[in-house]
């Protein structure tokens, strides 16, 4: 019997993935939010789940420790996608990658003047490409969390981060000034596993595809002001 290992992360992505797993006949026997187990058995003897950090999902799949996984587009862009097949946009965990600044910072003026802007983010590669395309001079500062704090204490002029409702920006007196791209989660498959385990993987791929909620456009985000 061919076994399949699926890499997932806790939180919103796992919650949004549960209906897709169920559509493929896969039900975890433990709740990752309450269980300390990092390897979860399922109702199927041939499928197990491993729980890893969201940023590590592509690495586990790339090197074959997992056959499949679900990762956000933001994570995949930073990873680079080597060794991965990305057959499906699952339309889950949707948000935006945006540039945000303090509400009293004149970002547009800084861009026009060609001022050098300090930007805090954990998405260095994506941010570097975005600002290079705009011809902006930026100093990128790597952070791993609490991005909203950076402009408030003078560490950075701007941040690049994921935004859903915008409530966190509003609570910290920040405003979004640019949308870099929409973000959602993708199904990723190890390229070698797709060849060697296609008969086991293909039915899951088809079940996921059939269960995807049709995409509805994200409503416009109010740039230049806290929502």
Swiss-Prot record:
Pathway the protein acts in: Amino-acid biosynthesis; L-histidine biosynthesis; L-histidine from 5-phospho-alpha-D-ribose 1-diphosphate: step 1/9
Localization of this protein: Cytoplasm
Repressor is among the record's keywords: no
Record's keyword annotation contains tRNA-binding: no
This protein's UniProt keywords: Amino-acid biosynthesis, ATP-binding, Cytoplasm, Glycosyltransferase, Histidine biosynthesis, Nucleotide-binding, Transferase
Alphabetical list of PROSITE patterns matching this protein: ATP_P_PHORIBOSYLTR
InterPro entries according to UniProt: ATP_PRibTrfase_cat, ATP_PRibTrfase_CS, ATP_PRibTrfase_HisG, ATP_PRibTrfase_HisG_short
Major subcellular location class: cytoplasm
GO terms, biological process: L-histidine biosynthetic process
The protein's Enzyme Commission number: 2.4.2.17
Written domain comment of the UniProt record: Lacks the C-terminal regulatory region which is replaced by HisZ.
Subunit text: Heteromultimer composed of HisG and HisZ subunits.
The family this protein is said to belong to: Belongs to the ATP phosphoribosyltransferase family. Short subfamily.
Function: Catalyzes the condensation of ATP and 5-phosphoribose 1-diphosphate to form N'-(5'-phosphoribosyl)-ATP (PR-ATP). Has a crucial role in the pathway because the rate of histidine biosynthesis seems to be controlled primarily by regulation of HisG enzymatic activity.
Name assigned to this protein: ATP phosphoribosyltransferase
Organism: Nitrosospira multiformis (strain ATCC 25196 / NCIMB 11849 / C 71)
Lineage start: Bacteria, Pseudomonadati, Pseudomonadota, Betaproteobacteria, Nitrosomonadales
